[in-house]
């Protein structure tokens, strides 16, 4: 999906709450890899962490994260692929999109025009079958006119919430399907992966027919979401890409475009998403990311962000069935 120019009115007709207008990404020349300075630390009378300098870069395209004391948690402290086990919620027969949209992704606000997005959207025709992402028990099947599951009554419209059989590190995991035209299951029913739980619609606060999918960890509430992109099982030969974009002070930069290029075609725009709008949205407990991209073919990529008039480019390798992680520090 290549979109170079967006019109606010057109985008609003596609997505829940609309999406930010991303500028035409700047075409790259031969990318220049920004060298990572070897940090030195001056000891003080009080105990301070001892940081191990990053090794000298090698020809490998896998970046070495530079650890900064101001960021918590540090990137990839444990294998991030540990919870890539949810199936695609859209039926393979669908004529619509089986990939989460990137123009109003998890953590977006549409430039501050809309509520912080706590899930991902799949644009599909009304009536498209929606499938269970995993085995689980239906704990909600109906609408949210009386019981609030989001910001307000009738926020999701017709919805289904599953408590999944499989837990993550002993913690309960929930999947929420919103804006359904029809609910096909009943509360208390057990479903298997791939079972149809509903049909795509636009009930509740929705513009255009689409599925809104959320992943909730620990508790079934609006404040316990995680980015579903980092829970979806990649297709064969694909992986997932995530990253963290930091400003000169080591703080996450909110809601800026992140552009991806294949390393073999550094001047050809491939895909684009954006960083999370605010720290109020939950990042992955392991990664601490502020952007993520699903269903990425295994290979080498260049990731570009632009802050002011300066561009920053970092390489990253995505391996099949795993999460590639890139950290971009926009220090001047």
Regions found by a protein language model. Name each.
Residues 1-23:
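Sec-dependent N-terminal signal peptides
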Residues 19-91:
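Ser/Thr-rich, Proline-interspersed low-complexity disordered segments
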Residues 67-159, 163-167, 193, 202, ...:
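Surface-exposed, glycine-biased beta-strand/turn segments
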Residues 114, 128, 204-207, 211-212, ...:
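Beta-strand-rich domain onsets/edges
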Residues 128, 183-195:
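Acidic, glycine-anchored pre-beta loop/turn
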Residues 177, 292-294:
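Hydrophobic core positions of the immunoglobulin-like beta-sandwich fold
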Residues 264-290:
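Short, acidic Ser/Thr/Gly-rich low-complexity loop/linker segments typical of extracellular
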């Amino acid at each position: 999906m290549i979109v170079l120019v967006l019109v606010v009115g057109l985008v609003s007709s596609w997505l829940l709450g609309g999406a930010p207008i991303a500028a035409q990404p700047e075409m790259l020349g031969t990318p220049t890899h920004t060298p990572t300075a070897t940090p030195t630390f001056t000891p003080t009378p009080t105990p301070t962490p001892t940081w191990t300098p990053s090794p000298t870069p090698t020809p490998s395209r896998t970046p070495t994260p530079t650890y900064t004391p101001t960021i918590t948690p540090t990137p990839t402290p444990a294998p991030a692929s540990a919870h890539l086990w949810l199936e695609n919620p859209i039926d393979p027969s669908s004529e619509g999109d089986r990939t989460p949209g990137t123009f109003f992704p998890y953590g977006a606000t549409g430039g501050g025009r809309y509520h912080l997005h706590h899930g991902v959207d799949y644009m599909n025709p009304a009536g498209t079958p929606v499938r269970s992402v995993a085995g689980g028990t239906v704990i909600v099947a109906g609408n949210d006119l009386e019981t609030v599951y989001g910001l307000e009554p009738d926020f999701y419209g017709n919805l289904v919430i599953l408590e999944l059989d499989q837990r993550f590190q002993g913690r309960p995991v929930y999947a929420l399907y919103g804006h359904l035209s029809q609910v096909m299951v009943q509360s208390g029913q057990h479903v298997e992966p791939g079972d149809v739980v509903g049909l795509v619609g636009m009930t509740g606060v929705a513009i255009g027919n689409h599925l809104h999918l959320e992943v909730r960890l620990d508790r079934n509430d609006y404040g316990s979401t995680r980015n579903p992109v980092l829970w979806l099982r990649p297709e064969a030969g694909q992986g997932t890409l995530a990253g963290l974009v930091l400003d000169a002070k080591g703080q996450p930069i909110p809601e800026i475009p992140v552009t991806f290029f294949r390393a073999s075609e550094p001047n050809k725009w491939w895909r684009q998403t954006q960083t999370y709008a605010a720290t109020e949205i939950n990042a992955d407990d392991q990664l601490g990311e502020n952007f993520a991209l699903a269903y990425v073919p295994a290979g080498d990529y260049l990731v570009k962000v632009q802050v002011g008039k300066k561009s920053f480019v970092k390489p990253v390798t995505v391996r099949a069935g795993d999460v590639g992680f890139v950290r971009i520090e926009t220090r001047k």
